[in-house]
Amino acid sequence: MREAVSITGQGIICAIGNDLPSVLDSLVHARSGIRPMKYLNSRHSELPVGEVQLSNSQMKRILGLEESTLASRTSLMGAIAIKEALAQVGKSRLEGKRVVLISGTTVGGMDLSENYWERMKNEDSLLNLPLCNDCGNSTVEMARMAGLEGVRCCTISTACSSALNSVMLGAEMLRHDEADIVIAGGSEALSRFHLNGFNSLMILDKEPCRPFDETRAGLNLGEGAAFVVLEKDAGSRTLSYVTGYGNRCDAFHQTATSENGDGAFLAMKDALEMAGIAPGDIDYVNAHATGTPNNDLTESRALMRVFGDNLPEISGTKGLTGHTTSASGSI
């Protein structure tokens, strides 16, 4: 087993809560955040989504920002989750340390880009396209709004694996002495671009999604952010350890997993081997469980390949939060 990495802080915001205690309470009581659109303006208003129940203006006030501050919803949610995670650690611990922020996002500031495109058409000018729409700059803006001036920033865009890839990269940086503290996770906001893309794949359910159910008909898109603070073995301050992980790409199809879940199977196998444990040591699996016919079937097959007849408890949370895509791994 390789050197363990400690998780010492956690922060989250999503459709079922604006912080860790409220999210946990919603999970325990199975309160769903899937509801009609409130903040997203879309022609597909019949589709339920998992929206964070705060406007951009409310999030700016939480962060102590002026209303005029130009910030994407992705950056605002990310900054709120980061600040919660840092509050648990104590910001003074960052002083004099090599701190890195790694965020996973694929949509970035698309919520702003969509609105500015309309202005560009009307005003015949490119000057209205703000830099903060870029995925990479979303991470820089999160750092600034969370009071992390001067930290190194990195952005990962690997769709639904983005946030967990951020955690994996952070753990590797610590193990190779490239950083002292890493804040890793992901943030993703709903946007028309986002919704339309998934709708074109015909995998969005008009009812609350039902992962692993025989009658499942698709997913509900969601939004949110979650970040963890990673440190080299932190002793008694450790909330949990990152002991093993795996990353595979079977290159089967751009939007579908292979029939027998080869990528998921190999990634889980790698994670177990890195951690130095056997499948029988696992008590619970939080599955990707999107609610689509393809994902849930192939993921189930991958799990059965790993665990055989001794399946542990398995469940997913997207039926409550919606599929938060790039942020889903850390959420």
Ranges and model annotations:
Residues 3-8, 26-39, 44-47, 204, ...:
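Condensing-enzyme catalytic core mediating Claisen C-C bond formation in acyl metabolism
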Residues 16, 21-103, 109-110, 267-279:
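Conserved active-site "lid/cap" helical segment
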Residues 21-25, 114-125, 142, 173-176, ...:
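A glycine- and small-aliphatic-rich helix-loop capping segment at beta-alpha/alpha-beta transitions
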Residues 41-42, 70-75, 129-136, 153-162, ...:
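Active-site nucleophile and cofactor-binding loops and adjacent substrate-binding regions
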Residues 60-67, 119-128, 145-156, 205-214, ...:
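Glycine/charged-rich beta-loop-alpha catalytic/anionic-binding loops adjacent to active sites
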Residues 79, 158-175, 219-222, 226-237, ...:
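Claisen-condensing/thiolase-fold acyl-transfer catalytic domains that form or cleave C-C bonds
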Residues 97-103, 153-157, 182-187, 239-245, ...:
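Beta-strand segments within the central parallel beta-sheet cores of soluble alpha/beta enzyme folds
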Residues 102-154, 295-309:
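Active-site-proximal gating segment of KS-fold condensing enzymes and close homologs
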